[in-house]
Amino acid sequence: MKYLVDTHTHTIASTHAYSTLQEYIAMAKHKGIKLFATTDHGPDMADAPHFWHFVNLRVLPRVVDGVGILRGIEANIKNVVGEIDFFGDYLQDLDIVLAGFHEPVFAPSNKETHTAAMINCINSGHVDIITHPGNPAYPIDIEAVAKAAAENNVALEINNSSFLVSRKGSEHNCLAIAKAVKEAGGLLVMGSDSHVAYSLGDFTLAEQIVEQADFPIERLLNRSPEALLAFLSARGHASLDEYSVLLES
């Protein structure tokens, strides 16, 4: 199946990434990607953009050359309370909010602490998608997290980058997550976690996990722009009408 949506990308605003937003738009056009989210790292990361970078995403057009661009962030889960490093009314101005564990912000601890932090973040209502929850550096109670995510209409990510250059050993956890989310009645999304435009929309290995779990396509947010936009609307993101042109093409 050709997936036309990517929810997880990084630009040169995160200085360990290597492509501009315009390069992503051009690559999306080239690959036939209809909708992608620009989700640079939250400001507590050492080389992340300033807080105001995310505030000023409002200047971005939502559709360029027939490609939809979601204004987003990959925030950092900061502590066991589940707080993230973007907050207040500014959250409402973003189209999509991702959050995950990153070692420079939240050092690996133990399974109980990781699970509590992730579930508290899910329960906060501030986050739409939890990124790379299968990271073996942060063991979690997978069934408990999947249940909390399903109850809160939060998607868990199968991160393609985790099978390539980062988070080695994620395969077993990601398959268990896909199966647990399926059992809990929740939602999955595949994210490229692209740090260079060439890997935009690359779900090659994540798709294998989804297929092994026999995960229902109707609960996979990448299946269409309509599916992701409906999810974000249900999550309370209001300003999505500008993407309607994507649904007409």
Curated annotation (Swiss-Prot):
Q: Which InterPro entries match?
A: Phosphatase_YcdX_put, PHP_dom, PHP_phosphatase, Pol/His_phosphatase_N, Pol/histidinol_Pase-like
**Free-text cofactor note:** Binds 3 Zn(2+) ions per subunit.
Query: Which of this chain's residues are annotated to bind Zn(2+) 1?
Result: 8, 10, 74, 193
Name the EC number(s).
Answer: 3.1.3.-
Q: Which residues are noted in the entry as Zn(2+) 2-binding?
A: 16, 41, 195
Broadest EC class assigned to this enzyme: hydrolase
Any matching Pfam family: PHP
- What protein does this entry describe? Probable phosphatase Shal_1519
- What GO terms describe the biological role, i.e. biological process, of this protein? bacterial-type flagellum-dependent swarming motility
What would be one Gene Ontology cellular-component term for the protein?
cytosol
